[in-house]
A protein has these predicted regions:
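Terminal accessory/anchoring regions of large secretory-pathway or extracellular enzymes
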Residues: 1, 6, 11-257
Length: 257
């Protein structure tokens, strides 16, 4: 099977051979399920669909996700082993089927740099694949390590002695976990100093969100998009909050510092 193929200069596709009639695509606060073939009323020869962060397909044994950065158009080629074709560059000389409307600037003449990622995954790892697809949207952030106190006591030393090793998880600002649950917002309140965090459950079934009560948290409560205070949450004996999120639910929490 082809690892990667191309139908021309405009797109790239991955043949998969997965035995399924549907696929998944990231949308606004949801991962939608779509049919690989359009219904009989579809007459357009192009079967392109809209995606945001990724498109994926899976059967009972395997799955494959194609993440992208800014490549929002894809098409499933059902007659080519269910390949996912991602549009890399769309260049057109004219628009419209009711006349001739030249669009010379839309020919996209030049050099372009594009980014996408192919993520194979096993059955039962759908949530982890989604997490990788969302993580691909973010650049790594570098942070300078602190200086060794021993270096401060060495007179005349010019080159700093950097501290190495792993950052301790105990000092994390917010630790959470949940199959297919992702953080979508972290902000200070508009009318008060409380912090607000928002999660979405991208799975088609209920999932449990768990997050630890950090030392800086005085109180955690359910909230909404207008930052109203709702039910106050209580952690378990280990200092962990557990909240069940319904399928595709968007949940907002307020945190009192």
């Amino acid at each position: 099977r082809d690892v990667l193929g191309s139908r021309g200069l405009g797109d790239v596709y991955k043949r998969q051979g997965l035995n399924t009639s549907t696929h998944l695509a990231d949308s606004a606060f949801e991962v939608v399920k779509r049919n690989n073939r359009h219904n009989g009323t579809w007459t357009n020869p192009c079967g392109c669909e809209r995606q945001q962060c990724f498109a994926a397909m899976e059967d009972e044994t395997n799955g494959l996700l194609v993440a992208n950065r800014g490549l929002y158009e894809y098409e499933v080629l059902a007659d080519e082993e269910n390949a996912i074709a991602v549009t890399l560059l769309r260049s057109v000389a004219e628009m419209g089927d009711w006349g001739y409307f030249p669009t010379p600037k839309a020919q996209q003449i030049g050099t372009f740099t594009l980014e996408f990622e192919v993520v194979p995954y096993a059955a039962g790892k759908t949530g982890e694949a989604f997490t990788e697809g969302y993580a691909f949207q973010q650049d790594l952030t570098a942070a300078q390590a602190g200086l060794s106190k021993a270096w401060l006591r060495k007179p005349g030393q010019v080159k700093p002695e950097l501290v190495s090793g792993e950052m301790p998880l105990e000092m994390s600002f917010l630790r959470f976990e949940g199959e297919g649950i992702h953080l979508t917002a972290f902000k200070k309140g508009l009318a008060k100093d409380d912090l607000f965090v928002r999660f979405v459950n991208n799975m088609p079934q209920d999932e449990v969100l768990s997050f630890r009560k950090e030392s800086w948290m005085k109180e955690v409560y359910r909230s909404n998009v207008v930052e109203e205070k709702g039910e106050v949450l209580c952690p378990d004996e280990n200092g962990v909050y557990h909240v069940t999120l319904r399928e595709f639910e968007i949940a907002t929490f307020g945190v009192v510092k």
